[in-house]
Amino acid sequence: LLILLIGWSNPLELQAVIPEEGRGLNPLLQHPAMAIHPPSLYLGFIGFSIPFAFAMGGLIRGKLDNEWVLTTRRWTLLSWYFLSAGLILGGQWAYEELGWGGFWAWDPVENAALMPWLTGTAFLHSVMIQEKRNMLKIWNVVLIILTFGLTIIGTFLTRSGIINSVHSFTQSEIGPAFLVFLAFILVIAFGLLFKRIQILESEHKMESVLCRENAFLAQNVLFVSIAFTVLLGTTFPLLAEAVRGTKLSIQAPFFNTVTAPMGYALLFLMAVGTLIPWRKTSMESLKKNFAWPFLLAFPLTAFIAFWLRDELWSWDGYIIFWLAFFVCATMANELIRLVRLRSSQSEDSAPVALFMVIRRNLRRYGGMLIHFGAVLIFLGVAGKFFSLERDLTLTKDQAQTIGSYQLVFRGVSEIPVENAIHRAAKVEVLDLDGKRLQFLNPAKSFYPTQPQPLTEVGIRRSFWEDLYLIFSSENGESGDSVTLRVFINPLVGWAWMALPIFTLGIAICFLHRPGRLVARETVLKERFRAAEQALGTS
């Protein structure tokens, strides 16, 4: 970092020309999420350097047992959480500020943060196998090397200025330095891994195809495959331009088509992987754990199909709904079974039994809560498959119907704000019975420092869906007519609810203390007391 600051990007370097007035913060960044989103991503990126450093230290010493996994578990969890928070808040910012009706577009800068999150998630699951079964030691080191390397690639893509992105607000000359650093890190890390590969051999082997180890391994392969797909789709246009001089653009349909089946498989394994026993299981056990959740997901999905609009149909959306219901039903089945067992043995009430069940294995049920948050994100994505989009031209005081809403245009007004002027269309939102629900003010914002007006969307939020208005144009000089782009986005708000659920899940996981770590701390405390007593008597 010091070399970068001195050689490439000195923040204290004087400008050649001193402007009379600064341009101020880019208006697109004037959003509450921007106070948290960049620091969260930064903390997530640098946080993964800690388990990486411990792994490299173990390789250098030639001693890499499970100690480094236990010692860095909380750092890994915290880094994963901050990356997750950064991604969710970034999606919320894009949804509210960029004015296109969505929250994820597979933009290169979005992908830069997603890739280490994917491999970091794989690492979090894979180290459980090392802790429980002393397996996959080599794979875990590879995963943490890849995760740290992808944080460097992400920084390079974001800061180098070689890509066009709606999220890129600055350019610098530090890109080549990051590539040199990345190459140096990867050569040293994989060199150490190959040198010490004998000490990382697994102590056990897979005993059955149907076991939790294989479910986690399949999950790992899917996470890494998605990360590789995203990396390929993000960097291939750069490579093509460098080699052939041809400018290419890989758009969202490529990513959606390739990653969707892998995402569905991950959601399925989310239900199956946590309830399959270690080592091996039987078909009878599978039926016991998964039969009724598997069947219950079908009528629940049919209910959603009946509730959604008749003119909208999406196999992808219904597949996600079925998988989400399967995951939730599986988790509910597990909790109900354990609570009943606890109640029958101790005569505790159901709430007390639930508390005691969770308390006995905080890590497991904190992870289950995080899985539920991930299901909410998938449901938010599924809702976009049923999004309704229309361009409406509204005449003053006349209503038009879209979905379950009536929109009445009440005129255009100029609203001065602190550093801009909003030219807003006042739109009254009614239900189909004519009851007023809300006034929305989608606008064009004029900033003195910006050559073009920016879009300010109007959003009516509800538990089930968002009504999302974009002020496209004002028709005529009198302002008696406007054209709006209108979206009805089902379930999009559920994706934002994942963040507080992740927060609670991580907090519960942090309360878990591995027995071996507690024993180690006890030994250290006893040694410290003995040393104090020895010093006191000398």
What are these regions (language model features)?
Residues 1-538:
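Solvent-exposed, non-transmembrane regions of integral membrane proteins
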